[in-house]
Amino acid sequence: MKVTPLGERLLIKPLKEEKKTEGGIVLPDSAKEKPMKAEVVAVGEKVENIDVKVGDRVIFSKYAGTEIKIDDVDYIIIDANDILAKIEE
């Protein structure tokens, strides 16, 4: 299934967080914070005020967007204004 965000929205895929602490303690899902880093999967046609493209890694607002599941994969549809930064490695 192909999903194309409308207007000034992006489709992002949250990045998996480490399940262990530095001390080796395994964290259950209920103890982990919601991830705030994601990879851009699709960009709406009216996104103009930020410089992101498919494949970029970004940091987004903690409670932003609408969570959806496509083919058993979690995604978030988010407004372009909720993108806080681009991660460059």
Swiss-Prot record:
Record's function text: Together with the chaperonin GroEL, plays an essential role in assisting protein folding. The GroEL-GroES system forms a nano-cage that allows encapsulation of the non-native substrate proteins and provides a physical environment optimized to promote and accelerate protein folding. GroES binds to the apical surface of the GroEL ring, thereby capping the opening of the GroEL channel.
UniProt signal peptide: none
GO cellular component: cytoplasm
Subunit structure, interactors included: Heptamer of 7 subunits arranged in a ring. Interacts with the chaperonin GroEL.
An MF annotation (GO) of this entry: protein folding chaperone
Pfam families, per the entry: Cpn10
Localisation per UniProt entry: Cytoplasm
Origin species: Pseudothermotoga lettingae (strain ATCC BAA-301 / DSM 14385 / NBRC 107922 / TMO) (Thermotoga lettingae)
Gene3D superfamilies listed in its UniProt record: GroES chaperonin
PANTHER family: 10 KDA HEAT SHOCK PROTEIN (PTHR10772), 20 KDA CHAPERONIN, CHLOROPLASTIC (PTHR10772:SF63)
Keywords attached to this entry: Chaperone, Cytoplasm
Protein name: Co-chaperonin GroES
InterPro entries: Chaperonin_GroES (IPR020818), Chaperonin_GroES_sf (IPR037124), Chaprnonin_Cpn10_CS (IPR018369), GroES-like_sf (IPR011032)
Biological process per Gene Ontology, one example term: chaperone cofactor-dependent protein refolding
NCBIfam families assigned to the protein according to its UniProt record, in alphabetical order: PRK00364.2-2, PRK14533.1
Family indicated by similarity: Belongs to the GroES chaperonin family.
